[in-house]
């Protein structure tokens, strides 16, 4: 039984992510982590969705039923859960969030005692326990062995101090006007607080969560709204987080969205110049533009490509011995400060570069010409194994014969197939994308 997608368990709250399934998953997770338990504590945080209350209570029920104590810390960014799990010496951490998805979805992400996301092997073991009725029945405890839960509301300060330490002490944001869009999500307190404490003049939008407005017309998925505020307020930069604040999208002072690959490219070169880039390399995903790779190669930096998902980026970073990586979509990891994508920490790295170089945002993050790319998210009815789709191999050969790079993959969280084409001729890309869409509509829709 497959529960986990590219980033934990995710689905419609009350359906796939129901109270019953969540409690069962919590018990399975507790059983798995019992073998490593040292403090018998598991940390639980969430974003601002209404369904988070239901899921949080179901998690607490399942975990305490198998003997774990639970610490509930309320709305908090995903990277904060990764940090605080290790900082507070918990045996595991759990984040309730569906990231950039609409409010009616929710999800559950798991971290080990060191703040690392679980690998596929660990997820499979939890899935096996989840499906084993006898294992779940036998693991339930009674009497004094049943766990307890408590809520702690002041741990946010630990994370704020940690994040601020990623910003050079020799620099200040004084004189910078920054607009931050918190997506009515988990970063609505931390993001503005950190920027203000570092000296910036801060304009905040998307900081009034009501349980239903997370990501709704705001945040990293809607930078056009941030752009309007940046222009209206004559700000130096705009920063957009997603619902769980593990992603960053930057808007320059002209209201233009900064390409995620170009942001990573500039930061990678800056880190190398300051002696902070380990291994003269970085990890990007198969979605990143070829222009990124060519630009960094000119600066003596090797680009390693992982599968999509910040978890896969982190695993390859560890494998290659590098401390910087990320995704075009805005998940950026600087592992000296965070073990997962961290939108606020990434924002501070970008701001530190602007302050130290004295450049405008529009001038700083446009270091090369990108290859034309087209990305389409095509809704589908079923996810057939790609290798079983008749005619797909011939289609890919046709794409390659046109001198284009392609990536066809299913979304790990939605019923969609993502179609990426990259090449030198934009018109040819459009024509080929039409052919690809027609093909997948015939075979999958």
UniProtKB/Swiss-Prot annotation:
Q: Which reaction does it catalyse?
A: alpha-D-glucosamine 1-phosphate = D-glucosamine 6-phosphate
Recount the PTM note. Answer: Activated by phosphorylation.
| PANTHER family per record | PHOSPHOGLUCOMUTASE (ALPHA-D-GLUCOSE-1,6-BISPHOSPHATE-DEPENDENT) (PTHR42946:SF1), PHOSPHOHEXOSE MUTASE (PTHR42946)
What are the EC numbers? 5.4.2.10
- Report the Gene3D superfamilies cross-referenced here: Alpha-D-Glucose-1,6-Bisphosphate, subunit A, domain 3 (3.40.120.10), Alpha-D-phosphohexomutase, C-terminal domain (3.30.310.50)
What's the domain of life for this entry?
Bacteria
**Sites bearing Phosphoserine, chain numbering:** 99
Stored Pfam families: PGM_PMM_I, PGM_PMM_II, PGM_PMM_III, PGM_PMM_IV
Question: Which keywords belong to this entry?
Answer: Isomerase, Magnesium, Metal-binding, Phosphoprotein
Cofactor(s) of this protein: Mg(2+)
Is Phosphoprotein one of the keywords UniProt gives this record? yes
Indicate the enzyme's highest-level EC class.
isomerase
One function term, GO molecular function aspect? magnesium ion binding
Q: Which organism does this record belong to?
A: Sulfurovum sp. (strain NBC37-1)
- Tell me, what does this protein do in biology? Catalyzes the conversion of glucosamine-6-phosphate to glucosamine-1-phosphate.
Q: What is this protein called?
A: Phosphoglucosamine mutase
Q: Which residues are noted in the entry as Mg(2+)-binding?
A: 99, 242, 244, 246
According to its UniProt record, which residues of this chain constitute the active site?
99 (phosphoserine intermediate)
Q: Which family does it belong to?
A: Belongs to the phosphohexose mutase family.
The biological process GO terms on file are: carbohydrate metabolic process; peptidoglycan biosynthetic process; UDP-N-acetylglucosamine biosynthetic process
Q: Record's GO cellular component, any one?
A: cytosol
The UniProt record lists the keyword Transport: no
Q: How is the cofactor bound?
A: Binds 1 Mg(2+) ion per subunit.
Return the CDD domains for the record.
GlmM (cd05802)
């Amino acid at each position: 039984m497959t529960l986990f997608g590219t980033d934990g368990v995710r689905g419609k709250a009350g359906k796939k992510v129901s109270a019953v399934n969540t409690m069962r998953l919590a018990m399975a997770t507790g059983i798995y982590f019992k073998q490593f338990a040292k403090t018998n504590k598991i940390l639980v945080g969430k974003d601002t969705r209404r369904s988070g209350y239901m899921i949080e209570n179901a998690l607490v029920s399942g975990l305490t039923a198998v003997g774990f104590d639970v610490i509930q810390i309320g709305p908090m960014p995903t990277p904060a859960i990764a940090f605080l799990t290790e900082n507070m010496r918990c045996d595991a951490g759990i984040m309730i969030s569906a990231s950039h998805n609409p409010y009616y979805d929710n999800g559950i992400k798991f971290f080990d005692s060191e703040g690392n996301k679980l690998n596929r092997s660990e997820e499979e073991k939890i899935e096996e326990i989840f499906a084993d009725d006898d294992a779940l029945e036998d693991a339930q405890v009674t009497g004094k062995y049943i766990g307890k839960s408590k809520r702690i509301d002041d741990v946010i300060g630990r994370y704020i101090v940690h994040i601020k330490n990623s910003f050079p002490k020799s620099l200040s944001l004084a004189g910078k006007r920054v607009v931050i869009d918190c997506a009515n999500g988990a970063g609505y307190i931390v993001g503005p607080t950190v920027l203000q404490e570092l000296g910036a003049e801060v304009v905040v939008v998307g900081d009034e969560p009501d349980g239903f407005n997370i990501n709704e017309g705001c945040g990293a998925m809607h930078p056009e709204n941030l752009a309007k505020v940046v222009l209206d307020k004559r700000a130096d930069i705009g920063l957009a987080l997603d619902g769980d604040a593990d992603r960053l999208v930057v808007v320059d002072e002209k209201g233009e969205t900064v390409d995620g690959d170009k942001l990573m490219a500039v930061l990678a070169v800056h880190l190398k110049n300051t002696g902070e880039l380990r291994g003269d390399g970085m990890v990007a995903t198969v979605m990143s533009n070829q222009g990124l790779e060519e630009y960094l190669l000119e600066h003596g930096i090797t680009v390693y490509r992982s599968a999509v998902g910040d978890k896969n980026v982190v695993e390859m970073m560890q494998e290659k011995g590098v401390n910087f990586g990320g995704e075009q979509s805005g998940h950026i990891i600087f592992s000296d400060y965070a073990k997962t994508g961290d939108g606020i920490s990434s924002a501070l790295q970008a701001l530190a570069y602007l302050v130290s170089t004295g450049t405008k945002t529009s001038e700083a993050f446009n270091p090369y010409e990108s290859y034309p790319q087209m990305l389409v998210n095509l809704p589908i009815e079923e996810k057939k194994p790609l290798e079983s789709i008749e005619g797909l191999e011939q289609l890919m050969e046709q794409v390659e014969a046109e001198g284009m790079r392609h990536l066809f993959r299913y979304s790990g969280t939605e019923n969609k197939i993502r179609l990426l084409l990259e090449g030198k001729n934009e018109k040819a890309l459009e024509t080929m994308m039409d052919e690809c869409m027609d093909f997948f509509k015939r075979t999958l829709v």
